[in-house]
Regions:
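Intrinsically disordered, low-complexity activation-like regions
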Residues: 2-110, 211, 278, 282-300
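Acidic, Ser/Thr-rich, low-complexity intrinsically disordered regions in fungal proteins
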Residues: 87-281, 285-300
Length: 300
């Protein structure tokens, strides 16, 4: 049995000041963790580089170095216009603690087993003001979709806040952005017969683009966050298969270009039950997706 790992990350988008307002910079690092607490094995890089696959099709004798000459990333400050938009949408306002805990419990119990893209340490080991607002609203959205309706805390409210945080680039960590965007699939206000920028099919394409940029389609050999990356990738594959089957839309992902290994117990830090459940879910979804593709292309 593999030892459990703590695959957490430091949030970059805490825009809430101690007084509850929005900060001009929009970002700050976590404070140092107390002594005795296990340090995170997933640390966001100050100079996040997207995946480049040029060396996979260029000959070895072609002098290409994708990592050379990369400029240091300058911390981005939200513009005054961005801050006004975020303030108007009241993105820094979260539900009261009892409501928040209830929705988070619903997320972990009913959503996470099927979309295991969030590390518990991202949320449980931090206060609300130390967690990505984009991630929090995405999780609250998902939790509210599988809970009894609360008149004052509708799913649409969480969705709109997460959406504006996404489009204003309030979150910088691409892994958290991808995970949160995957959770927006739980909001699907319109049927497939309507053209919409708010459906799961739309966000699927956004997630696909992010996944390829981050390189989630490649086996994360030797990475501390390998299990997290595999879970995010296969969660995206599942959504692609289900949307393909439910809506009849072409697949967004080409699995022939991916070499990510199947889900295993290691990816769930040694937890057998959730690993087996998600692995079976992925397998069934892939069979369904391949069957639909065969029918659509008349290959069967």
């Amino acid at each position: 049995m593999t030892a459990r790992r703590n695959l957490s990350c430091q949030p970059l988008s805490d825009m809430v000041s101690e007084g509850g307002g929005l900060k001009g910079a929009g970002f700050r690092h976590m404070q140092e963790q107390p002594a005795g607490r296990e340090q995170s094995s997933y640390q966001p890089s100050p100079n996040v580089v997207s995946y480049l696959g040029r060396l996979e099709y260029l000959r070895n004798d072609v002098p290409v170095n994708d990592d050379a000459g990369l400029p240091n990333k300058v911390p981005r400050r939200l513009s005054d216009t961005d801050l006004e938009i975020l303030k108007a949408q009241r993105v820094d306002e979260l539900p009261p603690r009892p409501v928040r805990d209830s929705l988070m419990d619903a997320f972990w119990t009913r959503c996470y087993p099927w979309t295991p893209v969030v590390e518990r340490s991202w949320v449980n080991e931090r206060g609300p003001k130390q967690v990505s607002l984009l991630l929090q609203h995405a999780m609250l959205l998902a939790g509210s979709r599988v809970s009894a309706t609360l008149p004052d805390y509708q799913p649409e409210q969480f969705y709109k806040k997460a959406r504006v945080l996404f489009w204003t680039n309030a979150e910088e960590d691409p892994i958290i952005i991808t995970a949160a965007t995957l959770l927006l699939h739980w909001w699907n206000p319109d049927g497939p017969e309507r053209v919409s920028l708010d459906t799961s099919g739309f966000w699927l394409r956004i997630c696909t683009g992010l996944a390829y940029q981050v390189g989630l389609h490649r086996e994360p050999t030797g990475r501390a966050d390998a299990g997290l990356r595999r879970r995010i990738w296969w969660s995206l594959v599942v959504r692609d298969c289900l949307i393909n089957a439910g809506h009849g839309r072409p697949r967004a992902l080409d699995l022939k270009l991916a070499d990510v290994s199947p889900i295993s117990i290691v990816d769930f830090e040694g937890a057998v039950a959730p690993a087996n459940l998600f692995s079976s879910y992925v397998g069934i979804s892939c069979i369904l997706g391949e069957s639909i593709c065969c029918h659509q292309t008349a290959e069967c």
